[in-house]
């Protein structure tokens, strides 16, 4: 880039997954299908939990909030991607890019916090069953959600305001389908040392600490389950936690994959594919993971679908 070639309000170009014009219709149909599946699956989870009184418990309340966050998270990036593919355009303005960065950080932080709360809920249910209703009361759930929301918003605003202080060169190309903070920092012409330090510190704090809490909860859960004398009791206890463990593995596994690919690989396509797994595939799979292995959820979904006139 040429020295002095700066722009106060730059326009970014999202390169997407492929520049091949022949692949664009296929990519459009693929991602439109995935987006609609994500919306439908998560919306069904929310409606099933709200319509069935048997599911009015902390565990299912947190699951419905997780589904709502997944809807919002996917809607932050997918509509713009679909519009760009359909219009065969790649541009996104400065305001739109900052908005994507901010909301992606908010919803990632919220999902992170909800997964920790769900792990704590399972820990209390298995390790302290007699005190479950006392500990996991609505007030505590509300306070924990509020705390998670405040932390996520503050984190997003901090990074967004720091990006506002940067100067960018023109002709900015992002090798992804949405504006990702790590790639935006690489395109800045001004010094990003403080930004990078903040990214590493906040990632360590808001990533490692919650994950450590989840690992601690499941260590205690496994210890308690192993003391159950019957094999049936052990299986039931582990089956309760199985779905959550799969979702946690997907969330943190794909998240670390995005983090490592952005810093360790020279292939922009690999990084873009890792981002697809993180922002598209995981929210789409979450409803399936939580419903297929859960008899109560399947029963509630059947009751909900049976109320739809066309299914009678």
UniProtKB/Swiss-Prot annotation:
Glycosylated residue positions: 5, 93
Cytoplasmic face of the membrane: 47-54, 121-139, 218-237, 293-312
Localization of this protein: Cell membrane
Example of a GO MF term: G protein-coupled receptor activity
Membrane-spanning segments: 26-46, 55-75, 100-120, 140-160, 198-217, 238-258, 272-292
Disulfide bonds: 97-189
Membrane topology: Multi-pass membrane protein
CDD domains per UniProt: 7tmA_OR7-like
Keywords on record: Cell membrane, Disulfide bond, G-protein coupled receptor, Glycoprotein, Membrane, Olfaction, Receptor, Sensory transduction, Transducer, Transmembrane, Transmembrane helix
Signal peptide annotation: none
GO biological process, one term: signal transduction
Statement: the UniProt record of this protein carries the keyword Glycoprotein: yes
PANTHER family xrefs: OLFACTORY RECEPTOR
Sequence similarity: Belongs to the G-protein coupled receptor 1 family.
Protein's name according to its UniProt entry: Olfactory receptor 7G3
Native species: Homo sapiens
Source organism phylogeny: Eukaryota, Metazoa, Chordata, Craniata, Vertebrata
Gene that encodes it: OR7G3
């Amino acid at each position: 880039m040429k020295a002095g070639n700066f722009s106060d309000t730059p326009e970014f170009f999202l390169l997407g997954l492929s520049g091949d014009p022949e692949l664009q219709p296929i990519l459009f149909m693929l991602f439109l299908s995935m987006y609609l599946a994500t919306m439908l699956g998560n919306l069904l989870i929310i409606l099933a939990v709200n319509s069935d009184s048997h599911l009015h418990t902390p565990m299912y309340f947190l699951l419905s909030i997780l589904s709502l966050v997944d809807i919002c998270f996917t809607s932050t990036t997918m509509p713009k991607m679909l519009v760009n593919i359909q219009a065969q355009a790649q541009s996104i303005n400065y305001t739109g890019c900052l908005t994507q960065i901010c909301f992606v950080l908010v919803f990632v932080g919220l999902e992170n916090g909800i997964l920790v709360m769900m792990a704590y809920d399972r820990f209390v249910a298995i390790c302290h069953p007699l005190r479950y209703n006392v500990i996991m009361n609505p007030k505590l759930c509300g306070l924990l959600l509020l705390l998670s929301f405040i932390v996520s918003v503050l984190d997003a605003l901090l990074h967004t305001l720091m990006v506002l202080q940067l100067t960018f060169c023109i002709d900015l190309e992002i090798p992804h389908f949405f504006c990702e903070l790590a790639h935006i920092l690489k395109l800045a012409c001004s010094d990003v040392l403080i930004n990078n330090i903040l990214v590493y510190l906040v990632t360590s704090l808001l990533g490692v600490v919650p994950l450590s809490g989840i690992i601690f909860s499941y260590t205690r859960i496994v210890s308690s389950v192993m003391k159950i004398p019957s094999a049936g009791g052990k299986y039931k206890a582990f089956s309760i936690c199985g779905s959550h463990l799969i979702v946690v593995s997907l969330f943190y596994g794909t998240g670390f994959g995005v983090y490592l690919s952005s810093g360790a690989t020279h292939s922009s396509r690999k990084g873009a594919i890792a981002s697809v797994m993180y922002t598209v595939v995981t929210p789409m799979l979450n409803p399936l993971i939580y419903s297929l292995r859960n008899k109560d959820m399947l029963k509630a979904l059947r009751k909900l679908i049976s109320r739809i006139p066309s299914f009678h």
